[in-house]
């Protein structure tokens, strides 16, 4: 689960964790262990070549990110689905268990032991995370993947101006241009969605129901934008005081949300036998459970692939890949979920794609201008890789 992130959001679950921390994915060998020859086995050279391949890392990152959104959409798309809190609780349980197993295997060596004092200070941030991920799944339940992806860009605007208000700074003209394109793409996407709903069933009661469903999706999406911004900005304010290291944020977020999500599920969701049968029909029950488990593991996969991408390319390349990944992510919704392909929807996807490129370019130029006068400390790979806060 972690922080479904969207790649363009500058703040993320690990941002602000101590920039000098070594990412566990970037250095697996212990100093006490002898270096093994690269050709130790028949496939040693082949795997070593893949491990240092920029193309392989980029493809792995894109596939892990796309699969996360597609699986989330699949799970919540059932016509009778109404157990979102339960789904998110399973995600958190799986992700927490995976983190602890990775720690035991030595993959997350710098994951600190649980600290109740830190947990109390971090708990309000975890509550904001619950709001973010719940509204995210509700929006994804009512909206198509392309529209969800396009509207998710609006979070960037709210976060940017929230940073200006809370932490100072400014918004560059190029960033303003990207914001305008993001708003334009969202308007086009909404218009295309409504047009497709009306033309598909005509001006009937069915059309009214379809538009009502879309309106519910837009309402949840609007709440998700502000919940995501509140979580990211609040986390940035608190995380500097916590001295969290790599993956501590992911661990605390998932662990602390488990009891909240379970209680909310028991209080607000229908656990009757009839409702469970509706949510988990026999013909899709196994695939739903597999999807729920995978979605919890996907947070680990995304973090690994992100750190891998940064290690063999650069943080700038990683940011650009995140922007470019919006296009295949939106297209995946057209392929897997039969979202309507219209001139308006294609135009919205293209404009949203361009807005992501413009925004990434503006942030790259801004960082270069900040680095030129002085030397800035390098951000850790996992701090950069976990900027996926939000989807999904």
Swiss-Prot record:
Signal sequence, start to end? none
**The keyword Nucleotide-binding is assigned to this record:** no
Offer an example of a GO molecular function term for this protein: GDP-mannose transmembrane transporter activity
TM region positions: 56-76, 81-101, 122-144, 150-168, 175-198, 214-234, 249-269, 288-308, 317-337, 343-361
GO terms of biological process kind: GDP-mannose transmembrane transport
Which residues are connected by disulfide bridges in this protein?
A: none
Q: Which GO terms describe its cellular component?
A: cytoplasmic vesicle membrane; endoplasmic reticulum membrane; Golgi apparatus; Golgi membrane
Membrane topology designation? Multi-pass membrane protein
Lumenal membrane side: 77-80, 145-149, 199-213, 270-287, 338-342
Q: Where in the cell is it found?
A: Golgi apparatus membrane; Cytoplasmic vesicle membrane; Endoplasmic reticulum membrane
Keywords, ordered alphabetically: Cytoplasmic vesicle, Endoplasmic reticulum, Golgi apparatus, Membrane, Sugar transport, Transmembrane, Transmembrane helix, Transport
Give me the Cytoplasmic side stretches, as residue ranges.
1-55, 102-121, 169-174, 235-248, 309-316, 362-392
**Which InterPro entries does this UniProt record tie to the protein?**
TPT_transporter (IPR050186)
Q: Where is this region: Disordered?
A: 1-40
* Compositional bias per record (Polar residues), positions renumbered to this chain: 29-38
Tell me which family the UniProt entry assigns to this protein: Belongs to the TPT transporter family. SLC35D subfamily.
Quaternary state and interactors: Homooligomer.
Role, per record = Involved in the import of GDP-mannose from the cytoplasm into the Golgi lumen.
Spell out the protein name for this chain: GDP-mannose transporter
Species: Neurospora crassa (strain ATCC 24698 / 74-OR23-1A / CBS 708.71 / DSM 1257 / FGSC 987)
